[in-house]
Amino acid sequence: MTWRSRREALRAILSGSRCARPASVFDPISMRIAEDLGFEVGMFGGSVASLAILGDPDIALITLTELAEQVRRMSRAAALPILVDADHGYGNALNVRRTVQELEGAGAAGLTIEDTALPQPFGEATPQLIAIEEGFGKIKAALDARGDPTLVIVGRTGALAITSLEDAIERAQAYEAAGVDALFFTAVKTRAQLEAIAAATTLPIVLGGPSEEISDWDYLAAQRVRIAVQGHAPIAAATQAVFDTLKAAAAGTPPMQLQGLASSELMDWVTRAALVKQRGANFLGLKK
């Protein structure tokens, strides 16, 4: 699957009538597992990227180069379309252009640009938002930088958790006017909030962590939600598994008695061992 076909697959989700559950992915193996299990799209969250690449919390320490290289590795490993959290675009509107170019070249099917002021400004104890005008400019810059018109650009606002529903809607309308392909909202908790957002906008909606009140997939689909992020449990599960295994090993548990390990069959599957062996036979004269 080419980069463009992945982007077209993401666009098909956004233009459809269902709400998709994305797989939270963070490396080549998680990409392959998600693809093999039948997920339609992967979400590479900013917090997950910070954990996977730096081992740091989500405080905007990661660089564009680090993010793009990880996306490139993931894109190479599987054909699953990836929606990448590009945070604030790593700077101003001109930096956003570079961000789009790098992530497009790395194989991202789509990316989100948000209006949170990152990194956190000096002296501010709580998250802040950039001005609507600056956010509008960032979206216009992102669209201008796009080499492949099928690359999905998503405008994201965190206003609902910081200012108000009215501000979130005003920002979303500005990003829609700028030409984004979809709108991403965080901190939507109630049906009333979601219905107000859906009524005030026309584009496909992506939700970050919908609350229990609105976690009905038919309802979400009816409100034009096409992707609903379900948190990032896989990297937490992987972290716990590594911790438990190393804890047992440190306590003296023999390797053959360690619990919860992937079988050799699963390891062969996720590493595409049979394909690598076939290539060895084809190109190195090795026996199958």
Swiss-Prot record:
Enzyme Commission (EC) number: 4.1.1.112
Keywords: Decarboxylase, Lyase, Magnesium, Metal-binding
Taxonomic path: Bacteria, Pseudomonadati, Pseudomonadota, Alphaproteobacteria, Hyphomicrobiales
Keyword Ribonucleoprotein: no
Binding site for Mg(2+): D85
Similarity comment: family membership: Belongs to the isocitrate lyase/PEP mutase superfamily. Oxaloacetate decarboxylase family.
Function recorded in the entry: Catalyzes the decarboxylation of oxaloacetate into pyruvate. Seems to play a role in maintaining cellular concentrations of bicarbonate and pyruvate.
Record-given protein name: Oxaloacetate decarboxylase
